Every structure is written in C-alpha cells, then in structure tokens.
Amino acid sequence: MTKPIPRIGSRRNGRIGSRKNARRIPKGVIHVQASFNNTIVTVSDVRGQVISWASAGTSGFKGTRRGTPYAAQAAAVNAIRTIIDQDMQRAEVMIKGAGFGRDAALRAIRRSGILLSFVRDVTPMPHNGCRPPQKRRV
C-alpha cells in the first residue's frame, strides 16, 4: 500500500517558521533544578509558560558527568542563549535542589548580562512528613 502524498499547506506538515521567536519577553523566571545526577534549567515568562529549557544531558554530557558543575554551567548557557535573542533584560531565579551544579548555574546566569531581580531557594523541605528511605549499607 502506498503512502498518501501530503498536501502542501496542510496543517499537519508543520510550521514554516518558528513561532516561539516572534514574542518579545522583557521579564522572565529562570528555574534551576540541581540534583546530584543532573541539572535542569528552565526559562519561563512571568505567567509560567516555558520559553526554553536545557539540561546537562541535552548539553552533551552523559552518565556521571551530568552531575558536575561544568555540565550545569553549560546547561545554563544553552537555556539562556535563546532568551537573549528575545530581548529579555530582567529575570528572577528560583533554585531547587542540593546538587553540585546550583552555584555553577547561578554563576553562568549572572555572567550572561541579564539583570536579576532576586534569587530564591525553593528547595522543598519536609516539616517531618514522610519517613525517609532506609540508609544504604555498602
């Protein structure tokens, strides 16, 4: 059975140009989630719609190298590269997690030239909620 030839101009063919770059966003929120295995940097506008994101894994690091500070710095640079093209001048930074990449990602964000209104630590802390997992015996 032969495949049908898609019509030019049909909606399913995809976009001709990227619609994401058309917006101009003056202020945004940069979320950094730093675990011990990976660092994820997400850039959103003030309403919470994601503009761009990058992680140490998508930046080319695999395995245990994803948890390194250098990988977190590379992920932050990759996420911020797209928002500088969209003229973002101000940003708020929310850092979550206790990984090694949290300071390196913040340093990369500061060097990018975006004016930071505040940096907030939003790491979830239990008020003695769930019982922690059993300690490892090696």
UniProtKB/Swiss-Prot annotation:
Keyword Chloroplast attributed: yes
GO cellular component: a single term: ribonucleoprotein complex
Gene3D superfamilies: Ribosomal protein S11
Subcellular location(s) of the protein: Plastid, Chloroplast
SUPFAM superfamilies with a match to the protein in the record: Translational machinery components
Region of interest called Disordered, as start-end residue ranges on this chain: 1-22
GO BP, sorted A to Z: translation
This protein's record includes keyword Nucleotidyltransferase: no
Coiled coil: none
Pfam family, one: Ribosomal_S11
GO molecular function: rRNA binding; structural constituent of ribosome
Alphabetized InterPro entries for the sequence: Ribosomal_uS11, Ribosomal_uS11_bac-type, Ribosomal_uS11_CS, Ribosomal_uS11_sf
Stretches with biased composition (Basic residues): 9-22
Keywords recorded for this protein, A-Z: Chloroplast, Plastid, Ribonucleoprotein, Ribosomal protein, RNA-binding, rRNA-binding
Protein family: Belongs to the universal ribosomal protein uS11 family.
Complex formation: Part of the 30S ribosomal subunit.
HAMAP family xrefs: Ribosomal_uS11
NCBIfam families to which the protein is assigned, alphabetical: PRK05309.1 (NF003698), uS11_bact (TIGR03632)
UniProt protein name: Small ribosomal subunit protein uS11c
Gene: rps11
